Design a protein with these regions (language model features):
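General marker for long, soluble alpha-helical cores
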Residues: 4, 10-78, 82, 86-131
Length: 131
């Protein structure tokens, strides 16, 4: 039996801002992620920071084109290193806690991070937290 609204899958983006980045240039994507991280770090509650970060990770995993997902993840990794150290700490803590919220999404993201990180500049690699 279909649900109240039928069995059609909802294909609307979870995060419209992130979805709009598909096809953008790298500087635009990096600036987007930097701004998003700054806003997330500014959230005054750790649980709310996790709640802000998790949908962004979900939206990334919904991008079917693997090369585009890699490109946006790469931009995210670069943007992370442009944050102030205290902002990086807050984002890192939220990301760790997000594994308890949606382990499948976060593990898929971590797999991509593990693949991309070695290809990035040493300054990016050294600033990104290792598990």
């Amino acid at each position: 039996m279909a649900g109240l609204f039928g069995s059609k899958k909802d294909t609307r983006p979870i995060d419209v801002g992130l979805a709009s980045l598909v096809g953008s240039d790298e500087p635009t994507a990096i600036e987007f992620w930097k701004k998003r991280f700054e806003m997330t770090a500014a959230v005054p509650n750790d649980i709310a920071r996790v709640g802000a970060l998790t949908p962004q990770m979900r939206e990334l995993t919904r991008i079917d084109n693997l090369e585009e997902r890699k490109r946006l993840t790469r931009a995210r990794l670069i943007a992370f290193t442009k944050l102030a150290p205290e902002q990086r700490q807050l984002i890192t803590a939220a990301r760790r806690k997000a594994f308890d919220v949606d382990r499948g999404v976060m593990e898929a993201d971590q797999k991509l991070v593990d693949e991309l990180l070695p290809t990035l500049d040493a300054s990016v690699r050294s600033a990104y937290p290792q598990a």
